[in-house]
Amino acid sequence: MEVPRVGHSISSPTSPCEDMMKNLSLDAIQLCEREGNKSLDSGIAEMEELPVPQNIKISNITCDSFKICWDMDSRSKERITHYFIDLNKKENKNANKFKHKDVPTKLVAKAVPLPMTVRGHWFLSPRTEYTVAVQTASKQGDGDYAVSEWSEINEFCTADYSTVHLTQLMEKAEVIAGRMLRFSVFYRNQHKEYFDHAREAQNNKMLPSVKDNSGSHGSPISGKLEGIFFSCNTEFNTGKPPQDSPYGRYRYQLPAEALFSPKTNLYFGDFYCMYTAYHYVILVIAPQGSPGDDFCKQRLPALDIANNRFMTCSEDEDGQLVFHHAQDLILEVIYTDPVDLSLGTVAEISGHQLMSLSTVNAKKDPSCKTCNISVGR
């Protein structure tokens, strides 16, 4: 069953009961406090003979949908006309609150064969823990409902964006990518102590670390993928990296071919903004066959390294590798393997450390029409 916005008709191509559900509708009902396991909704009478849902099972969980089914005693089963589904974010213990203006946490569905699909990006977010409980109900002639007791409360967590969702994000990013500019180096800014530690304690290597939670909440790489962040953007008038950086006054710089070549795979990771005009795309470079490559193959859209709208590596007429990046996006490039400092150089930048431009744990603007898709943010 697909859960619509209040007052909208619905259809559910993903439901196994599609034909039976074309005329289903959901309405908001008054939210209620619970005392014990009873419903105290005003205007709703309790009838003990209505069966209480038992053994609730939740399956087919995506970033903005799930299937739900349960067992019921056959007693008075034929009297059931509706199901009440009480859905709440786990951290919100008060069922008498709205998640968002005009969006109820309690859903009313016409009784249909189970399992049914609950879908709705306006009340389901990716990577979020929820609690769910169910009542059976019988609509009376006067419009009131007779209801069963509440089922036990069950918990589940929604999933990350799938490759289908990421492909939708990627297509939106392609629209604003702009023309391609040539570049020749990757660079990474940090504090002096970071590079000193790499030399002294890490055998002269920068080591991958787990990506933070910046960007889209549903991105499958946040908090999971290990890598090292690099930049490749250049100033259009000089063709060189900018002298300012939000991440530190010391910059490690190395030839682009040291990280990006036909021996690596390239993946699209995310597209987001931080309440500003700047838009960011996260790309992942993974040496072929590496653990990072295996991780990305299962979760991210792969890009043709020689032909995409974000960052390319191709051969010129002389067989030399040439590199280009999109002008109108800020690219954040994650390299999934350790990098030896001997492959490049460290030097202090002459510009400013612009802390306001840092994307560390930055939250995506959920209202931006340019970089959001119609699933959980």
From Swiss-Prot:
One Pfam family this sequence matches: PHYHIP_C
A cellular-component GO term for this protein: cytoplasm
Top-level taxonomic group: Eukaryota
Residue ranges annotated for the Fibronectin type-III domain, each copy included: 52-161
SUPFAM superfamilies on file: Fibronectin type III
CDD domains listed in its UniProt record: FN3
Cited function: May play a role in the development of the central system.
Family of the protein in this entry: Belongs to the PHYHIP family.
Protein name: Phytanoyl-CoA hydroxylase-interacting protein-like
Origin species: Danio rerio (Zebrafish)
Species lineage: Eukaryota, Metazoa, Chordata, Craniata, Vertebrata
Gene name, Swiss-Prot/TrEMBL: phyhipl
